[in-house]
Amino acid sequence: MAAKTPAQWKTLFENEPFHRENYYTGPLGPDYTPGGTCLRLWAPTAEAVTVTLYHKGDGGAVLGTEPLVRGAHGVWSIWLPGEQHGRYYTFAVTVDGITRETGDPYTRAAGVNGVRSMIVDLARTAPSGWERDVRPQILPAQRAVWEVSVRDFSQDAASGVRPAWRGKYMAFTQQGTTLHGDGIHPTCLNYLKRLGVKYVQLMPIFDFSSVDEAKPLLRQYNWGYDPTNFNVPEGSYSTDPTRGEVRIRECREMIAALHAAGIGVVMDVVYNHTYRTENPLNNTVPYYFFRQNADGSFSNGSGCGNEFASERPMARRYLIDSILYWAKEYHIDGFRFDLMGLYDAESINAVRAALDSLPGGRDILLYGEPWQGGASQLHRYEANKANLAMLNERVGIFCDDTRDAIKGGCFDAREPGYVEGKPGSFWDIGGAVAAWCRSDRLPPHAPSQIVSYVSAHDNFTLWDKLLCVRYEKPEFTARDTVALAQNRLAAGIYLTSFGLPFMQAGEEFARTKKGVSNSYRSSPALNRLDWNRAEQYHALVDYYRGLLALRAAFPRLGSTDRRAPEALQFFALEQPLVGWMLPAVWGDGAAWSALCVFYNPTETTRTVSLPAGQWKLLSDGTSSSLWRGPSRIFTGKAALAPYSATIFGAV
């Protein structure tokens, strides 16, 4: 009998009887007990499946090869008696006469480079006190996300992190680090605690393929948006990638250390595609887990060669199982979906519902990029900005409208935004402040659906963007007083807006990548956090620190109630100034009965009229901590410095 063509597989997988016959709700992957381990693999199109066992994760002798037995719903299984912790294995799956060696799609541990799966007793990977680790209790007004790569966080020798831990999970556990070990200027975890961000978003930490874990890392670098094993931590971030249990333990230690500091952990998840099509999912059930064009070839909405078919029942189940695994076994506090527009809205809502079913699960954040990376075969009900109304109100989106309004478009280096004086952009600033709840452009179910930001790992850093707009040939390492003022203004806008504030690590100390807009595989030196800049630009760091604390002191800005932005009172001001007042909610613990905020994106001082009453100056264009002590009281009129956000509190 002739082998099926890719188009024939597509027809089969889009046939409802196939799903009815083969949908499976029982356990999959390795089920470990001290007395033995059961391996279960969903492979409904397979003619035969065998497992090969190894003592090591790479090389070494074969311990044996055994056949699996096919059961109901296309599930193959085998019982391996005796102690199996630390045993490595691969499957050989035969489909249409072609046999492919593969790892287990449900594996929780792996050998070097993730080629061989590993049976693991998770209890043995728990760091000391893990059973007492709990998610930090973070109020909505305290929420702010700081995005960083594990590698970038501590790669810089100036970080004060011990050499063996630089660029590793364990760097997050080292206490008391300072710049060059000077004992004065905090770095890494010590720095984060002082800054006041309450969530760290980690760029991909599940096992990816673009870094060879068996080789030194000095010249290797990649962000990691090229996953291989979705339920296994990345090995290059561990101190020993050859031992499968080490990466699990050290990843958990990192999370526990952040929790102990009162900081939640958001995981950047990239289920939308895999690094290559020869991966455990496609090797096990060819073509099932990935969308296909009419001719059966792989659809490429990710721009990376394939895209995950979240709408297919067992693919959706895999997605939900994996998310729940990380939430339960790693105590993850939030999930950021890369290219969320490549998922169907029903699947994303199902993920939200599954998280909500966990103890404390309603506090787990869920947001993503509401766009795609190319033309997709998912033509309706995408989890994108156009379908925001279809998403659960606690599924958020990165708001490029806010980003581009504040700092300018991200694809044209020289296109200005509001802070650089773009004409007419002030109209969109009002929309951004209200998290677009008072606009017909989106609108969201609730302000908390909007991730307000001006920089992330993609595109230019904020500092580089500001300099590109100002100069035809920027000097990215030069100090620029106007760009610094514009940086403060940008922060002053999104940190006083409704929604979830988000920032790229180092935005608060003028991080530069010297004009490189896509550094996903640039040098470690270019991508690392330059901790010397945190000291050189300490006044900018302090400005962010003060704004974060000020925001937390006025809880209404963090409201998840869709009606909250309706209380904003915008002033009729001379263009391009923007001003607004927001009353506090009685009894919410706000430090002031109202906030009054003005933005001035011009190069001249401007005078505005204040609402009736007395107003304490809380923050101006250079200091965001005036509210912490005695400050001037204003009535009538006030002057706004050039390129400034000025904040008053009613007294």
Predicted regions, residues:
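The feature marks proteins involved in alpha-glucan
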Residues: M1-P34, V62-L63, R70-Q174
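Carbohydrate-binding surface patches
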Residues: D31-E47, Q569-P611
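Conserved, mostly hydrophobic/aromatic
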Residues: L41, F91, V148, L202, ...
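Substrate-binding/active-site clefts of carbohydrate-active enzymes
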Residues: R151-Y330, L339-P359, L365, Q377
